[in-house]
Every structure is written in structure tokens, then in C-alpha cells.
């Protein structure tokens, strides 16, 4: 991080960058999913090697479970910014903060999305990049990169929590 940034800004940017990368490495899940992610039975039964959850956006319409393998880069980020693994606890409690109601939690997720966007954009600008990334990029990049790598469409759809007979995944491919 640039030397001229104060310590608090560097720490906040590091946390935001971690959440940004977690969204990509987490099968392109969104920040609401990250906020709600818990250290559940699956996490411990997998030997702390994967997360399992139902997407927040579709939980009322679908019970499709998403499984996220914890690959080494994701584990590195978890070691730096996630809460310690305690059964039933949130992985990223800082997203919700002290918000208790669903409305307050949605507001906190929206605020954290804005924080991530602001901090990551300032970081890439300091590196001389001309792009303006957002959290949406994570989902689109996940789908696009897997497609370019030749991963079957059904696998990508399942990984993203979409039904395999749906065309929703196509909306995320090559858009970014």
C-alpha cells in the first residue's frame, strides 16, 4: 500500500481488498452471502476445506447449496481477515457489525459494498490502473474465467448457485 496512506486507511483497504477477493474466490458470491456465511457443520466435517451455504438472494425460491472449496489463496485471506472458526459463528462478522435486524443488516451490506468499491478503486488508481472495479466484477470474472478455461457450463452454474437448466449464468459471462 502507498506509504503516504495512514495506518487506518491501509488496514481498512486491506480488509476491503480481502472481501473483494473472497467474493471472486468464493465462486463469485456476493457480499450478502459473505456476510451471512457461517462456520457450519459442513465446514468442520470437510476438515475446514470448504464452505457450504444457500445464496441469500435465492433462498426463498431455491434450496440449491453452493460449496466453496477453500483453496490456498482463499485460506490466506481467511487467515488475515476472517473471524476464528467457531461452530455456528459468522466468518465475516465485521460486515454486519452490530446490526441485528434484517433491514439494518441490508444497510450494512450496502455500506460495506460502497466501502469496498471506494477503497479498491483508490488502490488500483494508486497502482496506475485505469479500471474501476466493483464487487459485481467478482461474479462476472468468476464465470468468464471458468468459461475461458473450458469448465463445463453446468459446473459454473452450480458453483454460482444457479439451476443448471437456467440461462442466468450466461448473463455473467464476458460482460466484464
For every predicted segment, state its role.
Residues 1, 71-130:
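Active-site/catalytic core of tyrosine-dependent DNA strand-transfer enzymes
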Residues 1-31, 35:
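Basic, Lys/Arg- and aromatic-enriched nucleic-acid-binding interface segment
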Residues 36-80:
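Conserved tyrosine-mediated DNA breakage-rejoining catalytic core shared by Y-recombinases
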Residues 28, 40, 80-84, 148, ...:
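Short, well-ordered loop/turn and helix-capping segments at boundaries between secondary-structure elements
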Residues 4-11, 87, 117-158, 162:
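Short, basic (Lys/Arg/His-rich) helix/loop patches that form interaction surfaces
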Residues 6-10, 56-69, 103-112, 129-137, ...:
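Short, contiguous acidic/charged loop-to-helix segments that flank catalytic cores in large enzymes
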Residues 55-59, 160-176:
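Catalytic-site neighborhood detector that most strongly recognizes the C-terminal catalytic loop/helix
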Residues 30-34, 143, 168:
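Extended, hydrophobic alpha-helical segments in both membrane/secreted and soluble proteins
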Amino acid at each position: 500500500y502507498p506509504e503516504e496512506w495512514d495506518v487506518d486507511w491501509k488496514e481498512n483497504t486491506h480488509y476491503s481488498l480481502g472481501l473483494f477477493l473472497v467474493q471472486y474466490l468464493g465462486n463469485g458470491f456476493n457480499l450478502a452471502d459473505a456476510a451471512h456465511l457461517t462456520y457450519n457443520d459442513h465446514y468442520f466435517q470437510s476438515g475446514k476445506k470448504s464452505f457450504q451455504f444457500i445464496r441469500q438472494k435465492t433462498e426463498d425460491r431455491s434450496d440449491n447449496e453452493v460449496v466453496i472449496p477453500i483453496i490456498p489463496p482463499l485460506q490466506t485471506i481467511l487467515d488475515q481477515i476472517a473471524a476464528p472458526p467457531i461452530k455456528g459463528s459468522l466468518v465475516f462478522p465485521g460486515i454486519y457489525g452490530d446490526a441485528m435486524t434484517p433491514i439494518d443488516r441490508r444497510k450494512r451490506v450496502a455500506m460495506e459494498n460502497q466501502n469496498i468499491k471506494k477503497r479498491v478503486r483508490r488502490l488500483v488508481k494508486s497502482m496506475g490502473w485505469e479500471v474501476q472495479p466493483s464487487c459485481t466484477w467478482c461474479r462476472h470474472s468468476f464465470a468468464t474465467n471458468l468459461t475461458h478455461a473450458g469448465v463445463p457450463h453446468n459446473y459454473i452454474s452450480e458453483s454460482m448457485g444457479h439451476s443448471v437448466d437456467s440461462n442466468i449464468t450466461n448473463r455473467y459471462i464476458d460482460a466484464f
